[in-house]
From Swiss-Prot:
UniProt keyword terms in alphabetical order: Oxidoreductase
Class of enzymatic activity (EC top level): oxidoreductase
UniProt source species: Saccharolobus solfataricus (strain ATCC 35092 / DSM 1617 / JCM 11322 / P2)
Organism taxonomic ancestry: Archaea, Thermoproteota, Thermoprotei, Sulfolobales, Sulfolobaceae
Catalytic residues (UniProt): C10
Protein name: Peptide methionine sulfoxide reductase MsrA
Residue ranges of coiled coil: none
Assigned EC number: 1.8.4.11
NCBIfam families assigned: msrA
GO biological process: protein modification process
Amino acid sequence: MEVATLGGGCFWCTEAVYKRVKGVISVKPGYSGGHVPNPTYEDVCTDTTGHAEVVQITFDSSIISYREILEIFFEIHDPTTLNRQGNDVGTQYRSIILYHNEEQRKIAEEMIREVEKRIGKKVVTELKPFEVFYEAEDYHHDFYDKHKYNPYCRLVISPKVKKFMKLFPDKVKIHEG
């Protein structure tokens, strides 16, 4: 098992996508990258904690690699917009990769260079060592699956999930049930 901690805008979006990725064991929304201990959602929304909305992904690296996790990451959000994803604005929505070891750091640096070359734009994704993860409040967990008809879910999250499924059909987890 390996862990990845990533922020690509609203954590409801990234959680919804990664829950559907083959090889992903669990996805938890939360806060990381800042300086205030034990922040709440309300604290993070003040733009003063330094934390970003992130997801902590536990995955089976024999099924999906960290590089593949990042390939999906760079497709499901815009890594060229600073402190913003769509209409979600603030440092809590910044693009961030919190690496857990040197191998993850090297892969992330390589991926950032590749994405910049491919799209011809500067990637503003922050890259820093992982320190601590604060799990989000219960009502943020599985938000998309619990509220599919919520306007934000329909207009913002659903297109990201569909984009993932279209671009990475071989990575889609077969839904049981």
